[in-house]
Amino acid sequence: MDIMTAIGCALKRAVPDIKKIYREKTEQGFVGHSFYVYPIMERATAEIGTYEMRRLSYCVVYFPDESKREINQQLDEMRARLLDNVTHLPEVHLRLLDREAEPVDGALNFTFSVRYRGLYEQEHNPMTSLTQKGGVANNGN
């Protein structure tokens, strides 16, 4: 299972009555009481050997149901629900770091990061021989 699918599972557990979870933008717009999930950035830091530390950041945008009144109340309730219930992704054994929820233009942006260390095999050509040309420089002595 990939991380995006695990995020969708965590959102579905936290908000079972959600109408839709999008992974792509739509030209028609998003229906109310739905999520749009997208990656923000990924960083890879090389470590000793062939290990890397990877940090991935994601944004989950919640669109409230506009047919109901009290949009701000819907955003407040969803902010509390996400911060209280979406803390880890058990399917991929990752904990969410730096969780933040902020209302922006009538929607709620829930951002977080995950971090993991991996062993990455890299193609390399082992040095089988070394040919040296040259010698010691003459210092004029």
Task: Give, region by region, the residue ranges found by the protein language model.
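Short acidic low-complexity segments
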Residues: 22-31
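A short, hydrophobic beta-strand-centered structural micro-motif
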Residues: 32-40
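Charged, amphipathic alpha-helical segments and their flanking helix caps
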Residues: 1-22, 41-141
